[in-house]
Amino acid sequence: MNLIAKLEQEEIERALAGKTIPEFAPGDTVIVNVNVVEGTRKRVQAYEGVVIAIRNRGLNSNFIVRKISSGEGVERTFQTYSPLLASIVVKRRGDVRRAKLYYLRERSGKSARIKEKLVSKDRTAAASQE
């Protein structure tokens, strides 16, 4: 492992101190809680939407979440290891066949729906036994 990769790995571990980032994939509906500073006040803002892309680049990893706000599509890019992220909660698993769901930008209504990934009973039983 070269020096830059080692430093990057240390920074990732430092950024994750006390935080856990759940496994999520494109198509999943997530709630991202972001720390927002307004003047002297600090508050947590929730942003809920569908993950349309994940970019894995070490410390520079990010993901794009898309939601419909007042009938208008809004996309926001989050840095995965940012200290501004309070938490990420996976609300629903989506069943898609693409890594990047940019085609959702042109779609609205029923055509923009994503099937839900149903976990079989065998997998849930195996997961609970471990």
From Swiss-Prot:
Q: State a single Pfam family of this protein.
A: Ribosomal_L19
Sorted alphabetically, the keyword list is: Ribonucleoprotein, Ribosomal protein
Q: Which GO terms describe its molecular function?
A: structural constituent of ribosome
CC terms in the record's Gene Ontology section:
cytosolic large ribosomal subunit
> Is Kinase tagged as a keyword?
no
Query: Gene3D superfamilies per the record?
Result: 2.30.30.790
A GO BP term here is: translation
Does Membrane appear among the keywords?
A: no
**What does this protein do, in the record's words?**
This protein is located at the 30S-50S ribosomal subunit interface and may play a role in the structure and function of the aminoacyl-tRNA binding site.
Q: Which family does the similarity line name?
A: Belongs to the bacterial ribosomal protein bL19 family.
Question: Which HAMAP family is this protein grouped with?
Answer: Ribosomal_bL19
The molecule here is called: Large ribosomal subunit protein bL19
Question: What organism is listed for this UniProt entry?
Answer: Burkholderia ambifaria (strain ATCC BAA-244 / DSM 16087 / CCUG 44356 / LMG 19182 / AMMD) (Burkholderia cepacia (strain AMMD))
Its ancestry begins with: Bacteria, Pseudomonadati, Pseudomonadota, Betaproteobacteria, Burkholderiales
